[in-house]
């Protein structure tokens, strides 16, 4: 499916700002950038907005979203709260927490994350389902987390 989105500004980089441009998207891929709508596809006028590339967060733990904002002046949120909870987490819990963390990322314009957390396959599942680009690594800890045994090391 092809659509054209019209925006007041399209910011390509720090030096190139286009005014009153159309972004053609076909099957969720940007296929054209032009100053007039192409083809007979649907035009969606976004009004007085700026469209720009998404942000990349190169160090996330999206599954830790539940302690966001707690204990910023100390590490107590991590040590006292999450390290008490994490040994009891399962993959389904991590998927749900990761989806919430990814929603937080997307709502602030972050479209790519580099994340590592327990149950990395669950984090990857959440990333795919939420539509964010993810570079996902696995966390291995013998204390405080859900240690699944030596099989974790061979992943």
Q: Locations of the language-model features?
A:
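Active-site mouth loops of central-metabolism enzymes
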Residues: 83-95
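Active-site beta-loop-alpha junctions enriched in small/polar residues
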Residues: 61, 118-119, 139-144
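Short, acidic/polar
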Residues: 92-102, 117-120, 152-153
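N-terminal metal-binding scaffold of metallo-dependent hydrolase/deaminase domains
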Residues: 1-39
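Divalent metal-coordination and catalytic microenvironments
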Residues: 8, 23, 28, 48, ...
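Hydrophobic faces of well-ordered beta-strands that scaffold small-molecule active sites
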Residues: 54-60, 113-115, 134-137
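Metal-coordinating catalytic core of metallo-dependent amide/deamination hydrolases
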Residues: 124-155
């Amino acid at each position: 499916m092809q659509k054209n989105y019209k925006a007041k500004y399209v910011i390509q980089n720090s030096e190139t700002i286009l005014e009153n441009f159309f972004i053609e998207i076909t099957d969720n891929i940007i296929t054209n950038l032009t100053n007039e709508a192409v083809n007979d596809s649907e035009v969606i006028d976004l009004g007085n907005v700026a469209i720009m590339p998404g942000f990349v967060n190169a160090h996330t733990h999206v599954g830790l979203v539940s302690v966001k904002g707690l204990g910023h002046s100390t590490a107590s949120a991590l040590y006292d709260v999450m390290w008490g909870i994490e040994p009891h987490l399962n993959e389904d819990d991590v998927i749900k927490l990761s989806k919430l963390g990814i929603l937080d990322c997307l709502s602030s314009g972050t479209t790519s994350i580099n994340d590592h957390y327990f149950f990395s396959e669950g984090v990857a599942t959440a990333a795919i389902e939420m539509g964010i680009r993810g570079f996902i690594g696995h966390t291995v800890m013998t204390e405080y987390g859900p240690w699944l045994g030596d099989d974790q090391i061979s992943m």
